[in-house]
């Protein structure tokens, strides 16, 4: 299903939360423990730390997705293990625009992207670096 038919994306809030914020746990715990959400992430668990900032999309009582971004010692803002309800391309694009706006000035933005989302990342300015069976490493091109 497409979440656009259920909610207007412009009314949806994308909240930025510290990786160990109690509010983060309240918002994402019901999702990260759901089998269907883990399956969409190729059965890899989600994790967080003080080095992470999470972008969480919600409206009312419903959370529609999240993208954690980890800041590495090498000055990289790294996207890995994210979830977007229904693989909604419009919501994923909106997440990426928020992340790019927040990090592009000070960090190199890299993503371990699910192959099925590579085209959406490409349309937001990411270029492929290395491809595997289920993932492609991508980097945001500042020369856009």
What is each model feature region?
Residues 87-102:
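Conserved acetyl-CoA-binding loop-helix of GNAT-fold acetyltransferases
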Residues 115-133:
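Conserved active-site alpha-helix within GNAT-family acetyltransferase domains
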Residues 2-41:
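Short amphipathic alpha-helix that is part of the acyltransferase structural core
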Residues 103-115:
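Conserved GNAT acetyl-CoA-binding A-motif
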